């Protein structure tokens, strides 16, 4: 479990592909202070497991399904990535509940600076936006953010200069792809209500069918 508060940015040191899977080695410093084999680290919002580490870098393995569902294929040696360690039970909770299980990707279609904030439009599949609400939470490349605009296929977010400077958003341009994790509470609520409506419809159809057939 993560919070969406980025601890530092790291640099891709190497990418080794094996078929559709890959191993990433990432150079960093702060998050290695108490790292152990098997620890979970969110890399651009993707929960990955540490398989090896030294004093200034760590390695994670990435399954084919994860590669396919995320923007990892867009990374190259030298790319910057957002990093966050799994939340400690006694730590502060500054963002929102983030699982590190990416739901899909989005494309940045607008970047506009207004006063002390920068607004980004993120175009994504409508299957993602249906679980979202205005002023609700969304995770973008591992960063916990608030939704300021919402249509069927576009989400608008806003970042202050501090967040931009402390994350890889400083390198984003129009056309950049980002990882999206929808708020898990919203997903559970949508699933619950959707199933409830399905059951209600099925029950109504069953009663009507029986009545029409003399039962």
UniProtKB/Swiss-Prot annotation:
Pathway: Cofactor biosynthesis; riboflavin biosynthesis; riboflavin from 2-hydroxy-3-oxobutyl phosphate and 5-amino-6-(D-ribitylamino)uracil: step 2/2. Optimum pH is 7.4. It comes from the Bacteria. Keywords: Repeat, Riboflavin biosynthesis, Transferase. PROSITE patterns: LUMAZINE_BIND. The keyword Magnesium does not apply. The keyword Disulfide bond does not apply. It catalyses: 2 6,7-dimethyl-8-(1-D-ribityl)lumazine + H(+) = 5-amino-6-(D-ribitylamino)uracil + riboflavin. Pfam families: Lum_binding. GO terms for biological process: riboflavin biosynthetic process. Catalyzes the dismutation of two molecules of 6,7-dimethyl-8-ribityllumazine, resulting in the formation of riboflavin and 5-amino-6-(D-ribitylamino)uracil. Homotrimer. Can interact with 6,7-dimethyl-8-ribityllumazine synthase, forming a lumazine synthase/riboflavin synthase complex, also designated as 'heavy riboflavin synthase complex', which consists of a trimer of riboflavin synthase enclosed within an icosahedral structure composed of 60 subunits of 6,7-dimethyl-8-ribityllumazine synthase. This is Riboflavin synthase. The lineage of its organism: Bacteria, Bacillati, Bacillota, Bacilli, Bacillales.
